[in-house]
Amino acid sequence: MARTKQTARKSTGGKAPRKQLATKAAAKSAPATGGVKKPHRYRPGTVALREIRRYQKSTELLIRKLPFQRLVREIAQDFKTDLRFQSSAVLALQEASEAYLVGLFEDTNLCAIHAKRVTIMPKDIQLARRIRGERA
């Protein structure tokens, strides 16, 4: 079932207010908490949607530079030892990698939506790659 947007509605009626006796008795028997306030929590999905909007607006790289550079050097080590990289080359690789991943996740999300889900799964990534012709 598709999710629909919830809107606040004014209550038109319901239970009558309780008598004060029950609340006074409960307040006397319960120990004083000293006014400890619960930390504010957003509803599930609110922060995720905010992050989606934030990262769609931004253009900065999302993977940290040094861990990515170590990964590039580790992969390059398998092909040839003692390779040196210009910083601009590593940056170009990172830009291309992030652009590829963003596109893959967009297609993956479309696959999940097509399956009437809102959660992406490994099978969505596999389907997206298969449709693209990257993996048989």
UniProtKB/Swiss-Prot annotation:
Residues 1-42 are annotated as: Disordered. Acetylation is generally linked to gene activation. Methylation at Lys-5 is linked to gene activation. Methylation at Lys-10 is linked to gene repression. Transmembrane segments: none annotated. GO terms for cellular component: nucleosome; nucleus. The modification N6-acetyllysine is found at K10, K15, K24. Residues 22-33 have a biased composition (Low complexity). The modification N6-methylated lysine is found at K5, K10, K28, K37, K80. Its main location: nucleus. Core component of nucleosome. Nucleosomes wrap and compact DNA into chromatin, limiting DNA accessibility to the cellular machineries which require DNA as a template. Histones thereby play a central role in transcription regulation, DNA repair, DNA replication and chromosomal stability. DNA accessibility is regulated via a complex set of post-translational modifications of histones, also called histone code, and nucleosome remodeling. This is Histone H3. It comes from Acropora formosa (Staghorn coral).
